[in-house]
């Protein structure tokens, strides 16, 4: 049975810092993401994009409001259950790849599988090899990540985000460190993964071309989503 929403949040509030330095980072944010769709969150630096992704990814709790995965609220879960839910249902891609530089491409992709603990070593090696083949790195699976180009490292990061076959992929500036050609390749790869696998993708980006190719664009300002636009809408922030 497929849930209506892969990921959703309602009335999220988040404060960062203490005392005089306390900042109201998210203000009543609500968002629904359905399977097979690609969403972009755009807005100026400091508007709350990354904070929102961390909360939706169950890496940081909200101060108020609710996050649900496949229509199931998660606030009641224990820390262990929350970690399992995160490992099983959510894949992450960041601007800086956070690869283990002395690990091979294959070993990096296997890290989330080892954490979840559901596959044998043989199965993990087979799945990681298949994922690297899917992102065009089948011939480099045994190469240490420090010997890969920036574009190749980001493709390893994409493969790693898919290690546990997540329902949702969250990407924080996934192409921000890449040149135009590699940015386009990485985003096209993510689009294909979403379309073919029925997954959902939410990414924070400053790249107009990438944002405008998404199914939905959500504009953020001062911790709020101020507007949501379907693909094809002219967005004022990019004019």
Annotate each language-model stretch with its function.
Residues 169-172:
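Catalytic Walker B motif of ABC-type/P-loop ATPase nucleotide-binding domains
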Residues 103-112:
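Short coil-to-helix segment of the ABC ATPase nucleotide-binding domain corresponding to the Q-loop/switch region
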Residues 65-73:
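Conserved ABC transporter NBD signature motif
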Residues 80-81, 104, 116-133, 142, ...:
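Short coil-to-helix "N-cap" segments within the ABC nucleotide-binding domain's helical subdomain
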Residues 20-23, 74-91, 121-122:
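ABC ATPase NBD coupling module
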Residues 144-154:
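Conserved ABC ATPase signature
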Residues 165:
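Conserved catalytic motifs of ABC-family nucleotide-binding domains
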């Amino acid at each position: 049975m497929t849930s209506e929403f892969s990921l959703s949040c309602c009335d999220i509030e988040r404060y960062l810092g203490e005392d005089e330095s306390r900042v109201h980072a998210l203000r009543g944010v609500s968002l629904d993401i359905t399977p097979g769709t690609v969403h972009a969150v755009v807005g100026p630096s400091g508007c709350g994009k990354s904070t929102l992704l961390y909360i939706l990814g169950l890496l940081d709790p909200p101060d108020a409001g609710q996050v649900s995965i496949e229509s199931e609220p998660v606030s009641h879960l224990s820390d262990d259950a929350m970690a399992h839910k995160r490992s099983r249902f959510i894949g992450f891609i960041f601007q800086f790849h956070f690869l283990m530089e002395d690990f091979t491409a294959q070993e990096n992709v296997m890290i989330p599988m080892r954490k979840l603990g559901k596959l044998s070593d043989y199965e993990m090696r087979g799945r990681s090899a298949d994922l690297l083949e899917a992102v065009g790195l089948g011939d480099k699976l045994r190469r240490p990540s420090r010997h890969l180009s920036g574009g190749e490292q980001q493709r390893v990061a994409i493969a790693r985000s898919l290690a546990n076959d997540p329902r949702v992929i969250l990407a924080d500036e996934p192409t921000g460190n890449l040149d135009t050609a590699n940015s386009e390749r990485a985003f096209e790869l993510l689009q294909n993964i979403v379309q073919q696998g029925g997954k959902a993708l939410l990414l924070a980006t400053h790249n107009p071309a990438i944002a405008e190719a998404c199914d939905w664009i959500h504009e953020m300002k001062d911790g709020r989503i101020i507007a949501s636009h379907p693909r094809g809408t002219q967005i004022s922030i990019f004019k």
